[in-house]
C-alpha cells in the first residue's frame, strides 16, 4: 500500500463511508453482495487497476481498467484515496467518486484490507470500519478448501496471512463473527442502520430541520 500522507477531511457528508475488512475465506464478499441487494442506498466502490481484464470481466463492473500512464496521472493529481502495487499491477480507490457519492447522500462501501483501511481513516476520520471474523480457524480452513480455488500450499499461506490480518480487528469499529450467515447479514445491516442515525449523519442529511429546531 502507498504511504502517501493525506490530510484528514472533517467535512461531514450526507452519505456515510463503510469499510468491510476480513481475511480471505471469512465470507466478506458474500455478505457485502447480500447487503447491496437489500439496500439500494449503498454504492459499492469499484477499484481502478492497470491489470488486463480477465475473461468475463467488464470495465466498470469488476474494475475500472486503465493504462499505467493514466493511473499514474490520476494518482499524481490526488484522485485516489489509497493505492497499491500488487504483482506488478496498480490498484486504487477513487477519492473523487467517493466524495461525489457521499455529497449526494449515498452511502459508500469499500471492500478493503486493514492497511487500506488505515489509509482511508487518515483521510476520512468518520469512516466506519467493520471487521468480519470466522467462527474458528478450523472453519476458515474448511471454507478455503471448499472454495476449490487454491492449491494446498496457497491455503496454508492464506491461513498464515489471516492470523496477521485478524490481529488488526481491534482497530475496527465493529466486529461481526460470520458463523450463521443470516445472523451475520442482519448484524451488518444493523451497523448500517445505527450509523445512519448518528447525530452527525442526521444533521448532515437534515440540515435545514436542525437549523429550524435550533440544534447545533
Swiss-Prot record:
Chief localisation class: cytoplasm
GO cellular component annotations of the record: cytosol
Molecular functions (GO terms): ATP binding; guanylate kinase activity
InterPro entries noted in UniProt: GK/Ca_channel_bsu, Guanylate_kin-like_dom, Guanylate_kinase, P-loop_NTPase
Subcellular location, record wording: Cytoplasm
Superkingdom of origin: Bacteria
Record keywords: ATP-binding, Cytoplasm, Kinase, Nucleotide-binding, Transferase
Recorded catalytic activity of this chain's protein: GMP + ATP = GDP + ADP
Residue ranges constituting the Guanylate kinase-like domain according to the UniProt record: 15-193
SUPFAM superfamilies per the UniProt record, alphabetical: P-loop containing nucleoside triphosphate hydrolases
Enzyme Commission (EC) number: 2.7.4.8
Residues annotated as binding ATP: 22-29
NCBIfam families: guanyl_kin (TIGR03263)
Annotated family: Belongs to the guanylate kinase family.
Function, as annotated: Essential for recycling GMP and indirectly, cGMP.
Protein known as: Guanylate kinase
Organism this protein belongs to: Cupriavidus pinatubonensis (strain JMP 134 / LMG 1197) (Cupriavidus necator (strain JMP 134))
Top-level taxonomy: Bacteria, Pseudomonadati, Pseudomonadota, Betaproteobacteria, Burkholderiales
Amino acid at each position: 500500500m502507498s504511504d502517501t500522507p493525506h490530510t484528514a477531511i472533517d467535512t461531514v457528508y450526507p452519505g456515510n463511508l463503510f469499510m468491510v475488512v476480513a481475511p480471505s475465506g471469512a465470507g466478506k464478499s458474500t455478505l457485502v453482495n447480500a447487503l447491496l441487494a437489500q439496500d439500494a442506498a449503498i454504492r459499492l466502490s469499484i477499484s481502478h487497476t492497470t491489470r488486463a481484464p480477465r475473461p468475463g470481466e467488464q470495465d466498470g463492473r469488476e474494475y475500472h481498467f486503465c493504462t499505467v500512464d493514466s493511473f499514474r496521472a490520476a494518482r499524481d493529481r490526488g484522485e485516489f484515496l489509497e493505492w497499491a502495487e500488487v504483482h506488478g499491477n496498480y490498484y486504487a480507490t477513487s477519492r473523487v467518486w467517493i466524495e461525489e457519492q457521499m455529497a449526494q447522500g449515498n452511502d459508500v462501501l469499500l471492500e478493503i484490507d486493514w492497511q487500506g483501511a488505515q489509509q482511508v481513516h487518515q483521510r476520512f476520520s468518520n469512516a466506519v470500519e467493520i471487521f468480519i471474523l470466522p467462527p474458528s480457524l478450523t472453519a476458515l480452513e474448511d471454507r478455503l478448501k471448499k472454495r476449490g480455488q487454491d492449491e494446498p500450499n496457497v491455503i496454508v499461506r492464506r491461513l498464515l496471512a489471516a492470523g496477521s490480518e485478524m490481529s488488526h480487528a481491534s482497530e475496527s469499529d465493529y466486529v461481526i463473527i460470520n458463523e450463521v450467515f443470516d445472523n451475520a447479514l442482519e448484524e451488518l445491516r444493523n451497523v448500517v442502520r445505527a450509523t445512519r442515525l448518528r447525530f452527525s449523519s442526521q444533521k448532515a442529511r437534515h440540515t435545514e430541520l436542525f437549523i429550524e429546531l435550533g440544534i447545533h
